[in-house]
């Protein structure tokens, strides 16, 4: 067994030594490059690379496309601030009449103010154009001032005033009123006689008055002689018809 194995080793060493000697003593030149081989099979796809940086915008050369379909409504935003009030709208249609209310409690006429007065001339002061009826007959609520001859309104409403004045001469009288200091001549009455007989000049009217308004009788400076005697009297009266609403 050892004989053949030893011979085999010796043969291999001899061949190797011979090759080394041959290479050192006689080296042949390199041959020409061979022809390119056929392309190999396509390799497997490589791994996906990382995302690159965004490129520069391209030049827009295409035609704008058609408008797309309307998208879905977005979520509701936060409530806005309260705006300014808008202009008033047109007047609406008249509503249906409401149900009749319950009957109220009966009123008491005694609780209502009822200003009224009557005054005559007995010993009036001389001078001036205001006809002063100095003697009071009735003065409910005391609206009449006998020292000045003026009625002063304390309850706004509609009033009736009247006068009857005795004279033997030509006479002209007027019912005069004032409101907030503005005097206005309301209505005038005149009568004439040439025989010196007694005559009565009378007049009356309805006035709407506010609180503080005044009413009086005034004579014409040239035609204002009033008879003064005990056998006949001149009278000035007034009263509230109904108060203002």
From Swiss-Prot:
Q: Which GO terms describe its biological process?
A: astrocyte activation; cell-cell signaling; complement activation; complement activation, classical pathway; complement-mediated synapse pruning; innate immune response; microglial cell activation; neuron remodeling
Segments carrying the region annotation (Disordered) are 27-114
5-hydroxylysine (modified residue): where? 33, 48, 67, 100
- Keyword field contains Disulfide bond: yes
Any inhibitors or activators noted? The C1Q subcomplex is inhibited by sulfated molecules, such as triterpenoid sulfates, heparan sulfate, or chondroitin sulfates.
Describe the processing and modification events after translation: O-linked glycans are assumed to be the Glc-Gal disaccharides typically found as secondary modifications of hydroxylated lysines in collagen-like domains.
Disulfide bridge map: 172-190
Molecular functions per Gene Ontology: amyloid-beta binding
Q: Indicate the principal place this protein occupies in or around the cell.
A: secreted
Look up the record and report any one GO term of the cellular component aspect: synapse
Please list the residue ranges annotated as the C1q domain: 110-245
Keywords, A to Z? Collagen, Complement pathway, Disulfide bond, Glycoprotein, Host-virus interaction, Hydroxylation, Immunity, Innate immunity, Repeat, Secreted, Signal
**Biased composition regions of type Basic and acidic residues, renumbered to the chain:** 27-38
Q: What is the effect of changing residue 222 to E?
A: Decreases binding to IgM and IgG
Question: Where Ca(2+) is bound, by residue?
Answer: 199
Cleaved signal peptide residues: 1-22
Q: Is rRNA-binding a UniProt keyword of this protein?
A: no
Q: Which disease is it linked to?
A: C1q deficiency 1: An autosomal recessive disorder caused by impaired activation of the complement classical pathway. It generally leads to severe immune complex disease characterized by recurrent skin lesions, chronic infections, an increased risk of systemic lupus erythematosus, and glomerulonephritis.
Query: Which proteins does it associate with, and in what oligomeric form?
Result: Core component of the complement C1 complex, a calcium-dependent complex composed of 1 molecule of the C1Q subcomplex, 2 molecules of C1R and 2 molecules of C1S. The C1Q subcomplex is composed 18 subunits: 3 chains of C1QA, C1QB, and C1QC trimerize to form 6 collagen-like triple helices connected to six globular ligand-recognition modules (C1q domain). Interacts with CR1 (via Sushi 24 and Sushi 25 domains). Interacts (via C-terminus) with CD33; this interaction activates CD33 inhibitory motifs. (Microbial infection) Interacts with Staphylococcus aureus protein Cna; this interaction results in the inhibition of the classical complement pathway.
The Swiss-Prot or TrEMBL note on domains reads: The C1q domain is the ligand-recognition domain, which specifically recognizes and binds the Fc regions of IgG or IgM immunoglobulins. The collagen-like domain interacts with C1R and C1S proenzymes.
Annotated protein name in UniProt: Complement C1q subcomponent subunit A
Report the source organism: Homo sapiens (Human)
Tell me the lineage of the source organism.
Answer: Eukaryota, Metazoa, Chordata, Craniata, Vertebrata
């Amino acid at each position: 067994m050892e004989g053949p194995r030893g011979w085999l080793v010796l043969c291999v060493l001899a061949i190797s030594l011979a090759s080394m000697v041959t290479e050192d003593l006689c080296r042949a030149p390199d041959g020409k490059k061979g022809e390119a081989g056929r392309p190999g099979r396509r390799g497997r796809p490589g791994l996906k690379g990382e995302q690159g940086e965004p490129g520069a915008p391209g030049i827009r050369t295409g035609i704008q496309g058609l408008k797309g379909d309307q998208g879905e409504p977005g979520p509701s935003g936060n409530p806005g601030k309260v705006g300014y009030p808008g202009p008033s709208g047109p007047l609406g249609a008249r509503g249906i009449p409401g149900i009749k209310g319950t009957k109220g409690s009966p009123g008491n006429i005694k609780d209502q103010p009822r200003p009224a007065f009557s005054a005559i001339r007995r010993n009036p002061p001389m001078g001036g154009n205001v006809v002063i009826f100095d003697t009071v007959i009735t003065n409910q609520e005391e609206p009449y001032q006998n020292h000045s001859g003026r009625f002063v309104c304390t309850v706004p409403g509609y009033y009736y005033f009247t006068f009857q004045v005795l004279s033997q001469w030509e006479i002209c009288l007027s019912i005069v009123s004032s409101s907030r200091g503005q005097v206005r001549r309301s209505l005038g009455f005149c009568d004439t006689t040439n025989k010196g007989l007694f005559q009565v000049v009378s007049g009356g009217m309805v006035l709407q008055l506010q609180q503080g308004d005044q009413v009086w009788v005034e004579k014409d400076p040239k035609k204002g002689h009033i008879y003064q005697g005990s056998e006949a009297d001149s009278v000035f009266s007034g009263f509230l018809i109904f108060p203002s609403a």
